[in-house]
């Protein structure tokens, strides 16, 4: 009731995070889905025909799930509360005709999953040793975790021994903000500018973690030029 217009994704998701006021109209958008899509594109990940496991059923989950089903993926949703998972399933099947979505308990996750998406806060700092999963389905090719602190999450660590490609949620966060700025100002951010923001943010996070672990002590860095 507070908006004059709303874009398709925001309408289907029942979620607006950006409002543009122009020509006497208020228009609502959801840029989270754009940030998520760009994260996958950055890693060369195609969803068409892939079997995707989604952990969680909240706001971030709905964004990931919507993009998956609109791109032709077979989606499996799991979580502690299956009723909430089924509610997300219904919302998506109502919004996207032909969406292929199933709901399973964590004990009965299909083994032929290609992509694992974590939308839950499980594993976020400071409880970074907690994990929403204790193993990855054996066909997993890619792991995306919406958490960005720590930059390598407990879910992502499951992929490390297998050399499975992973991505944390910081790029999604940066890109959804960049798209919001474009909607408001018409200015498009160059990819290099976004990469610079990423590097600086990771650096600040690393320094903060060192301070928390060791206190503000003098550190001596040894190594190749620029590596420190």
Give, region by region, the residue ranges found by the protein language model.
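Rossmann-fold NAD(P)-binding glycine/threonine-rich loop
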Residues: 21, 141-191
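Rossmann-like NAD(P)-binding element
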Residues: 81, 108-130, 144
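Rossmann-fold NAD(P) dinucleotide-binding segment
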Residues: 123-143, 153-154, 158
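Walker A (P-loop) phosphate-binding motif
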Residues: 214-228
């Amino acid at each position: 009731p507070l908006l004059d217009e709303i874009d398709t994704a925001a309408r289907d998701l029942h979620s607006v995070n950006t409002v543009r006021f122009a020509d006497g109209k208020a228009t609502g958008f959801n840029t989270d889905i754009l940030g998520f899509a760009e994260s996958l594109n950055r890693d060369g990940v195609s969803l068409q025909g892939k079997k995707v496991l989604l952990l969680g059923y909240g706001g971030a989950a709905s964004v990931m799930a919507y993009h998956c089903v609109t791109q032709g993926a077979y989606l499996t949703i799991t979580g502690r509360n299956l009723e909430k998972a089924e509610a997300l399933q219904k919302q998506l099947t109502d919004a996207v005709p032909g969406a292929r979505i199933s709901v399973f308990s964590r004990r009965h996750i299909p083994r032929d999953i290609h992509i694992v998406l974590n939308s839950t806060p499980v594993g976020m700092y400071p409880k970074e040793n907690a994990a929403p999963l204790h193993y990855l389905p054996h066909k997993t090719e890619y792991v995306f975790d919406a958490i960005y602190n720590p930059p390598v999450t407990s879910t992502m660590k499951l992929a490390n021994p297998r050399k499975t490609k992973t991505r944390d949620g910081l790029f999604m966060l940066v890109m959804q903000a960049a798209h919001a700025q474009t909607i408001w100002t018409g200015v498009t951010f160059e990819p290099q500018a976004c990469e610079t923001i990423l590097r600086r943010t990771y650096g600040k996070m690393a320094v903060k973690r060192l301070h928390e672990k060791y206190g503000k002590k003098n550190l001596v860095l040894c190594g190749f030029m620029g590596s420190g």
